[in-house]
Swiss-Prot record:
Family: Belongs to the formate--tetrahydrofolate ligase family.
Protein name per Swiss-Prot or TrEMBL: Formate--tetrahydrofolate ligase
GO biological process: tetrahydrofolate interconversion
Pathway(s) served: One-carbon metabolism; tetrahydrofolate interconversion
Source organism phylogeny: Archaea, Methanobacteriati, Thermoplasmatota, Thermoplasmata, Thermoplasmatales
The species this protein was found in: Thermoplasma acidophilum (strain ATCC 25905 / DSM 1728 / JCM 9062 / NBRC 15155 / AMRC-C165)
Gene designation per UniProt: fhs
PROSITE patterns recorded: FTHFS_1, FTHFS_2
Amino acid sequence: MRDIEEIIKEIGLGRDDYELYGRYMAKLDLGLQNRGRPRAKLILVTAMTPTPAGEGKTTTTIGLGQAMKKLGKNVAIAIREPSLGPCFGIKGGATGGGKSKVEPSDRINLFFTGDFPTITAAHNLLSAMINNHMYHGNELNLDPKRITFPRTIDMNDRSLRSILVGVGPRDMGVLAGDSFVITPASEVMAITGLSLNYQDLKARLSRILAGFTTKNKPVFAGDLKAEGSMAALLRDALKPNLVQTTEGVPAFVHTGPFGNIAHGTSSLVADKIALNLFDYVITEAGFGSDLGAEKFFNLASRIGDLPINAVVLVATIRAIKHHGGSKKEGEDIDAVKTGSKNLIRHVQNIRNFGIDPVVAVNRFPTDTDGEIRALGEILDSNGIKWALSEVFAKGGEGGIDLANKVLASLGSHEIKRTYDLKDDIRTKIEKIARNVYGADGVIFEKKALSDMKKAEEIMENPYVCMAKTQYSFSDDASLLNDPHGFTIKVQSINISSGAGFVVPILGEIMTMPGLPKHPAAENIDLTDSGEITGLF
């Protein structure tokens, strides 16, 4: 691994443009997004509906960047920071794999430059100030039963989904129900990822909805005078992190909103700085085209005024067979043929946004030549561009064909958004449900209708950031492959007025995940020499 300063000098940055965090990590100055050079080409990486283990979207993003570098391109990648929840939960580390990783992987996975703890602290500072205000006289007349801002922690802990605070004598605070969300679902995480400068950051923080008064009036973080101290905590967290891939490609790794319960992309400042420093930028969006990619097209790229010049859609034989109902070990051509419907539907989603994607078939050792050949024939017959990707095993060399096809697909596209910003919230939700998920309709529970009314009173033309299972186009994780004839049920709608969007809660999705029966944490260890093992 090279010193990060060597890579920074190759980029052409001066000493005032960055701050070192050890030998291998750095933070970049926010002013770099205003350099004013010609805009680069942005390549978005998304995926088909995944299995719980994931389909290698981050690995593909990294490997594609390495392949483009081998072709002589001036390229960088932009991915999200890992959360401790998945690291210790099902997935383990989230920095790529094999010969296509970002380094130093162990540090990036475990606290990195401190952005996640800082965002968690800023979020919980507001929670503390809300309760403190009610304890000391409650001048704003906040209703303890109508506090809408939860607490946060970067850990999967189902026991914190619903709690009581202030239990005990009067000096323990105000007794009230409360809850935790995981840090990637925190509104402060979203705000950090969407803010472009400190002025923007403070304005967004001040607009966070804290709760309502006993007379049903909204109270914001600005009313509690919390935005200044929150912004002070977030000063360095707003600056994007620069590291490198296995083969020395510059890698922006910044903020970490989940794609299923948040907006699912790396920070706008990371993308914008990368676009000003490189000719090609590859950025990823969480989970499938129905989640992270939908939010990138309809939300993030709109807010950041980002181009989208090409899309890569990651698929695996494993996931295709899963959606095809495969129950047997070894080759299963019939399951490939059946499960390919899921992939084709994701391709159509991207085409509906105005871009013809390139499918990257991320090869696993268990894939047979017959299965790959069968999938290739299906893709060819549907006019879908595709390439076999072997970047896990071979690094950049394993992605040359993919890189060439992606470069050939680059263009200036007129993006077709799913909804108009002037649409009302109900219409926006229904358009996403029908046009992206393929739902027949949407059912709004009583609480969702009440929440929607409040949101429309508080916010003007908000974006919509759906919270939905990643395992199905529907809101039911058991409906695999290419479901039809289903309706979406909106249980409630969270108001993220600081971030500028509402979060409809669909089906049984949780904003605080739980650990599996045998979490990845059981396999992680520290050796006597200080080496971390079991993260991958």
